[in-house]
Amino acid sequence: MERYEVIKDIGSGNFGVAKLVRDVRTKELFAVKFIERGQKIDENVQREIMNHRSLRHPNIVRFKEVVLTPTHLAIVMEYAAGGELFERICSAGRFSEDEARFFFQQLISGVSYCHSMQICHRDLKLENTLLDGSIAPRLKICDFGYSKSSLLHSQPKSTVGTPAYIAPEVLARKEYDGKVADVWSCGVTLYVMLVGAYPFEDPDEPRNFRKTITRILSVQYMVPDYVRVSMECRHLLSRIFVANPEQRITIPEIKNHPWFLKNLPIEMTDEYQMSVQMNDINTPSQGLEEIMAIIQEARKPGDGSKFSGQIPGLGSMELDDVDTDDIDVEDSGDFVCAL
């Protein structure tokens, strides 16, 4: 890590801590996720690194490299100076339909690319969507800890993700198509941007996890009367929030939906993005063998020293062992800041 100087903490989570660093030579800023060596370097960490490394798209936080310190595995990635999309909604209360569409178009563009690379995210949520520092912010998907590649891993079965964003078929604990489940999570994100609340949580009992699950399974949601949403947008939501995954709208169909296509920036079109990707010859700085060797070494315990700090965006959990009849689990986070 001699190549980087730490500027400040930018948060902490279940994984460890995140810090803002500067490349001593180039003066470039990066975010670094520090994960304690030893038991915490599990298959999720390896999956996150391997999947993230393969993705190169303007709406995905770019992976740079992994570095081993005496105490931690450090994942170096692009720094998104604009913070979380979640924080922006908290400040605004909710977005206008045009602003929501602007960010949704970028979200779908990034997710579509992930799926084209045979990777489903499985934990799409506002806290995992960051913004760069520009005036018209570019959305950046991050956190691939729960992602699965159909090229490297089996079809998803485990119930992972954040309760408010989980698709009905994921709750059923059977094998499901992670790409189709991602569509549902994108719909939840769109709804939250428009309304400033989660679609399937009871506003009077936002922490009643059992009720949230019941509402998800029965697709029980509504757009409040005080929120002005066009019929085209309502139609798109109704096509996303479909319990049967085989009948749910797909990402390619979303990209052809009239509401999505309105005011679509040229850089969001498939043709433009294809040309950008063909011209992106900037290959990852590390080979697979080097990365795997670093991960293997990181599984050996370090000297045990710890960092401190706070990071937003908690709330993901493994739900395989949860009994939905006897649930005492916190929800994904109340919208105390909105409305």
UniProtKB/Swiss-Prot annotation:
It holds the Pfam family Pkinase. One of its GO terms (cellular component) is nucleus. Its EC number is 2.7.11.1. ATP binds at I10, G11, S12, G13, N14, F15, G16, V17, A18, K33. May play a role in signal transduction of hyperosmotic response. Can phosphorylate BZIP46 in vitro. Together with ABI5, PP2C30 and PYL5, is part of an abscisic acid (ABA) signaling unit that modulates seed germination and early seedling growth. Residues 4-260 form the Protein kinase domain. The lineage of its organism: Eukaryota, Viridiplantae, Streptophyta, Embryophyta, Tracheophyta. The gene is SAPK2. Phosphorylated. Transmembrane segments: none annotated. It is an enzyme of class 2 (transferase). Keywords: Abscisic acid signaling pathway, ATP-binding, Cytoplasm, Kinase, Nucleotide-binding, Nucleus, Phosphoprotein, Serine/threonine-protein kinase, Stress response, Transferase. It comes from Oryza sativa subsp. japonica (Rice). It is found in: Cytoplasm; Nucleus. Its main location: cytoplasm. It catalyses: L-seryl-[protein] + ATP = O-phospho-L-seryl-[protein] + ADP + H(+); L-threonyl-[protein] + ATP = O-phospho-L-threonyl-[protein] + ADP + H(+). This is Serine/threonine-protein kinase SAPK2. Expressed in leaf blades, leaf sheaths and roots. Expressed in shoots and roots of young seedlings.
